[in-house]
């Protein structure tokens, strides 16, 4: 401050702003000094004078002097001339001149030079702009504007960005004011004048300004801050102006209101114009925030709006940093803005607290992305604008912040209301429009009175204020009332949604960006948001998609907003309430809460803040509040932040957090909504009715809680009522129930500790609300009331205990979500269902709400019965639907329950909370019950939905997916959103496969119910967005993590969480205080774990809060944004960020992973406890739970949880995909999100994605599409799977909880594992689930029982204990052994080691995890899909397979494999023992994930040496296990029969394992002698010299891989492999590693694989099912290993990598495991059973596997190897599978690939086997890899392979073209979006790659031989696919990077970087290939070479 000249008056600036300005000034001084130094140095050099002049810049000064000879000050000259001239030209625009002058002078006085410069530029342009409209506006503006400027914010604002802000604000205001009496600043006029008359000029000018702004910002700050400053000043000024304006008592509230109406109608675009002078009203949505700010400011809720707008602007229009800055500024500004600060001082705090997450995201180029080009149309059509915004959103979202930011931008209108919820969240997203809302949200408390007074109902009020401003402004529809109705209520709804929607929306934003409608639709939030928008402009889109209903609801609800209490519009209200729920919390809730709950909010600022944060957090305030205040509520709020974070990477923290917060906020803001909606009306109502509704609410909430039974009845009653008069009951019940629920549950929650679960529930509900949004009918109605209740309760809870809030919220949410619960169930079950529910919710809502509500009631009753149960049910419903994402974001945030949102969310929350074990167990029971009920209900509902919503389903699915994803990712969507897109796609795809889609919904619902946890886990897919967001968030900080957790998606996102990793981290830190805090802490821990040793500690905390963490882990979904959603919405956590930036684009993986971890861990614990039925114990042993579970048999639960974690992790990876896309992939994911969001129609999504693709999300797009598709289907599976996974993971989590490694491993590997598993499972499970869904339903209950009873848990713990102990003994040699033992014993050492490992690994893991995360992102991109799918698959596959395939027996083994690692294990387990198997597989998986993660951590930690130490142990373990498995498989090929014995064996198998280890060695020796020998040798070597061997091999592998593949590819991949394989490929890699340990090439990756294999082995030993899985895997491994070995060391290296990756896929990701085992199982089945059905499943699994592999595992070669083995049977079965897959899974691309894959698999396998090592090296890599890639492509795993062959096939961008297009949405979607970027990526490859890389690539291309070689060899095998493969293989490199953002993210850290990463990979590949690869290597064989030559 001292440096600022006295002339600068910063009085109007808040500290943050002043600080930023000072920073800029200081930087300016520094730069000047540096320049002087430089020049002085230059002058010292005796050189040519001309040269000197040129270098020193004297020439310029000279020119300037000549030009401005009379000007002494060059800077002044530079500034004045433009401004001066422009202003002079605009004599009329004297005001502008004045502001400009003032800007110059005042700016000089008050404003920093940079700003003044910028301002002056802006001003000049504004003048230019303004002067166009000067005639019209100048007259008014000069006086008014001057007056307004001077009077209100005159000097201060001008100081800030007087000209710009004035311009910006004036523009909208000007239109507004000119029309109305209000007078904005002249500067605004410039924009306004520019916007109405000169659109082109406006655009040009806007763009110009943006460019100048960006340049200025960059120069000034080189930070987002600069961007922030660019916009922040404007916003600040504007806000300040308005703040002063209002402060001065010059409240233009009335004017504002009027203006709002008018402005919304007329000046809607004006706002944007203000933001973007070029486009009136809509032209510049990017500037929308400013517009909103101005607009809002001028509205009654000006302070809030101002602040919110300010924040939003920052988030949206400005850089994220800007946003952050703004938000911070806003916070200080809030202080400054008297009205706001007076009304909502907490808001300021919230904002301040919230700002950091937002702060993290600062896309500098957001302005460009948000550039006018997207706005122009938008301005005309609000709806279109929103959509348009969404379309540009990908671009906008492209940057970290952009991701969020553009998203907001894209969803600006949608988010307007939303924004109010998530001021920064949605502000971030929809800074322009949303800002108005956001501020409302923020200012609801303070401005609530206004608005309240303004509108009879707060909702109406803030809807009008907020909605009008945000929404209607957004809509910009002439009929303000209609808009107001739609918007104000919508706003309310939006707001409610905002927190949730923010998260969801963020997710959706990603999705929405890709598929505006779809995304929005997919996002409940989005949907609701859409509805909000839809009401205005998005209605048609939404409506078109079944969102019309939601929209209609929204509309009516808008009206209802006013009439929250009115039940007449209850249907609408319900949706609106759903929205209000979401939005309520954020907007309505928040606002209403603010008004009604203002006291409550204030009373329980934590709750309110959480709500606010959740709501507003979306807006920084609530989040900040939550962050600060509620964090114990942090979990919730953090989720909120996470959700928003999920939603917005930069704002991701916020947006994703909102995503998470969406979850959390959903939770929170569901509560808030309840409070909000009922705040004024309902609060009293709620409070009045609380008791009455308490029962009802208790139905939902208390059902969850002690009122379980009462609530059962009430729930039924409620649901019946709701079903009967859903609208009214929803409204009433929702409100009353919610409130009572909140209150009752609050108490009860407090008592029951279900609060946490409820919190999750609330989050879920919140999320669910958005889901309900999707469902929007009753649900919404329901939710709002409930939300209000929830809000109140959450307030209480937050006040009391965030836990309770969560629990209460959950119940409440569930309750009010329960009526919508069923839709929610459906929705929850299937976020697709949610989408369906939106439609169906309307249709079926009434219809289904009767049945579904009843069922939901039932389910909810079950759920309610058990808080966890209810949570599970509700969460299943809610979480699945809204809760899942909600929970995912919210719960994930809190509970990390995105993956296992229901159970985990609830359970996790519960476990996290007080009664996790009980609740969880109940949840399990209920899950079983719910499973049955919900299954049935879900089924029927699904059927209904299928019937009714099938058409809608596409739309609904979109919404559902989005809901799903958004919730997961919600937060972030984004990645999660992306995920949601994928899900949506799948859903849409599953429109055809309605059973799949709807089934998925059903299964999700059912599974949600039956394995709510799993459902939650599925919804942990939320982390999809969350993941992305998480990753993003992680990058952002814990924001994404929060988002991830929250969204789990939005996925927290994980993305959100990750993004909020820091924020969330803090939140988590805060969280620890409360259960939710613990959850949050867990999340944070997860984040931290990912982020750092801190995370390790936190991980421990998380482990303690493991539930949360676990949930978080699973949640990791965001992050892919589903936010993003999944793309890279949030950069998610640091770890995730490392990963998710790599993931998000690394965030998902990284952050998601952490988040997934956290989520997963939390859910694991929660779920484990619940599932284990040791909930109580679990509670006791939350920390001990890991050990205890292990010992108690919680291992199964833990394992399941872990699996959930794994599932969730993949989701995070999916999220990561989102996150990756969000981060790096962020852009991609955006595209992907958009792409995926389109639904199953890849084209639509592709289009959107393409938009994003160029942004870099294409890769994610493809992958995401795949992912989403798989996710959609897999979500169903995931629903089932989550339970198992949850249980499985809990163990792993448990173990890993203690061992941070677990989290890391679990998070990273597990996540990836899950991701892969999910992918694989998704594919497989989709079919399997579809096929076995019914079966599953039945089995699901048993599975749930298995999980719940932990047959597996007990037997698993027993077996696992034994296995672990024995294997621990085996592993005792290695850290793994210790780890195992420790895990067994609750080994601290491993924890410590892991901690150390984690710490060390943290770096490695951060990098690798980044890579991993990137892979994860890929996976996560597919992950969210995958994870949910995996979860579902794991649950579904595990359970379905277990039940279905159990029935099949051996055949089941394949399904088991299909489950992925866990699913495979599950399957194996299933084969062996139904219950045990199911649980154990999950457990095994979780363990594997955990172990893998642990291994990964350890590996990373021990830097390879420990990993290798672990790896050897793991290898040994896995070898033994795999040998056992393999041997039995190989020997008997009776995986199931053998597995059964083996399962029995597993207990004994530890010993047997060693024997079998030997046998396996033998077996392996037999199948793959080279590898077998290596296996033996390697096993011994690994065990003995794993470290040495590992390092040596790793180095060798690296070198060889480098040589074989681009070093980059290898290196990142190796890291990925190390991280990923450890987690996912441990088993496979174990074999590979063992097989290839000596074959170093494999080992580096193999070692990770080894680690993973070991992890799996450990899991195996942990769980017999794991062993079985391992058994299956061993066969798989055998083939993999065999080919790998056959391939040769070099090849092995490549293969090793591939193998690892494949194994990562197989073992790491269920997919890979699945595929391996699938193949094995398929073989077994084929041989044993010979039944096409099992093989079909195998095929499915394989397809899934392939897909996952493609997505997740670059080591497809191994897969093909294994596939090769099963190839013959598999070929035929694969076709069947494809057919089945195609039908159910919609793997048409996969089907297509499948056939190819069969061919290629066989081919590749044969090739691999037949090729000599050298040939194999290159050729294998090429051919096998290609084949693998082909198979992967075929199966949807092209990416993995492509990753490997990035460079090699880079020259053949066209090669993947075919697949790329086909696979784009699908594969890329599946993989990570970055792959999607393949097509676009190709060009991007050329363009984005460094010259070095480009040259290398070109070199490769130039090498016609190389090209020919690449083409010829593979082409000979599979010409078409080879191309794709080749092309994809390069992509797999990327994909790997994508998939394992670790590889990409570490290098790039962001999705955009992902391409860079790919480039790096490519260059390495190219270099390696070019440099190290001999010509021979290029050829399949010498003949090829010769023939080619």
UniProtKB/Swiss-Prot annotation:
Biased composition (Low complexity): 1416-1431, 1933-1943
Skewed-composition ranges (Acidic residues): 1959-1989
GO cellular component assignments: endosome
Disordered: annotated span: 93-117, 348-391, 631-651, 806-827, 882-933, 1094-1113, 1124-1152, 1365-1493, 1521-1590, 1644-1737, 1921-1989
Biased composition annotated in UniProt, kind: Basic and acidic residues: 377-389, 910-927, 1379-1390, 1551-1560, 1573-1589, 1658-1670
Tissue expression remark: Expressed in keratinocytes.
Assigned keywords, A-Z: Epidermolysis bullosa, Phosphoprotein
Gene Ontology MF terms in the entry: small GTPase binding
BP terms from Gene Ontology: intracellular protein transport; keratinocyte development; multivesicular body sorting pathway; positive regulation of exocytosis; positive regulation of protein secretion
Ranges of biased composition (kind: Polar residues): 100-111, 359-376, 641-651, 891-909, 1098-1110, 1434-1447, 1685-1709
Residues modified to Phosphoserine: 603, 806, 809, 1028, 1086, 1124, 1505, 1753, 1768, 1821, 1851
RabBD domain location: 7-63
InterPro entries named in the record: EXPH5, Rab_BD
UniProt cross-references to PANTHER family, sorted A to Z: EXOPHILIN-5
Disease with which this protein is associated in UniProt: Epidermolysis bullosa simplex 4, localized or generalized intermediate, autosomal recessive: A form of epidermolysis bullosa, a genodermatosis characterized by recurrent blistering, fragility of the skin and mucosal epithelia, and erosions caused by minor mechanical trauma. EBS4 is an autosomal recessive disorder characterized by mild skin fragility with onset at birth or in early childhood, associated with acral blistering with hemorrhagic crusts. Skin fragility improves with age in most patients, although mottled pigmentation may later develop on the trunk and proximal limbs.
Assembly, per entry: Interacts with RAB27A.
Its biological purpose: May act as Rab effector protein and play a role in vesicle trafficking.
UniProt name for this protein: Exophilin-5
Species this protein is from: Homo sapiens
